[in-house]
């Protein structure tokens, strides 16, 4: 009920301000990064962050641009990136290739290689050397319009 929801928002719980960065991670061919200055914050429950093992100092929010990760991530979705989680296992990550930031599903592709995979099958996989890409963090949460 609404009353129960309001009781859960009593202010007794700690919240952490997670910076929303003024750059986008492209779900497409790649977006040139502008700067990494926060323009706003998302408030996340400290309890939720602890339950999920997240360090608030290692989290940033970015906006998804493009359609290559649809239907998982849509253009305009906000994503939470755990910068403390590098590529240790397959999953959705934010990567930098040159000046471009991209959000892609990563998979091992043999010794010293990595595959950048789109959810949208209209985009073919891209295989690169680990030296060509910097894994900035793992996508751990998303928010978007219905």
What spans do the regions from the language model cover?
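Short, surface-exposed secondary-structure edge patches
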Residues: 68-72, 82-86, 130
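Short coil-to-beta-strand transition motifs
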Residues: 96-102, 132-134
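Glycine- and charge-enriched low-complexity intrinsically disordered segments
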Residues: 108-146
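Short, positionally conserved secondary-structure boundary motifs
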Residues: 1-75, 136, 141-146
């Amino acid at each position: 009920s609404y009353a129960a929801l309001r009781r859960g928002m009593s202010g007794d719980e700690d919240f952490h301000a997670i910076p929303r960065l003024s750059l986008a991670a492209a779900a497409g061919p790649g977006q040139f990064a502008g700067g990494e200055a926060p323009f706003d914050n998302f408030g996340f429950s400290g309890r939720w962050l602890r339950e999920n093992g997240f360090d608030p100092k290692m989290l940033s929010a970015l906006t998804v641009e493009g359609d290559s990760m649809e239907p998982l991530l849509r253009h305009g979705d906000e994503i939470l990136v755990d910068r403390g989680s590098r590529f240790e296992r397959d999953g959705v990550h934010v990567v930098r290739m040159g000046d471009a930031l991209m959000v892609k599903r990563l998979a091992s592709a043999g010794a010293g290689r990595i595959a950048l995979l789109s959810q949208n099958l209209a985009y073919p996989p891209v295989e690169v050397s680990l030296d060509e890409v910097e894994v900035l963090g793992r996508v751990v949460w998303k928010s978007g319009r219905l």
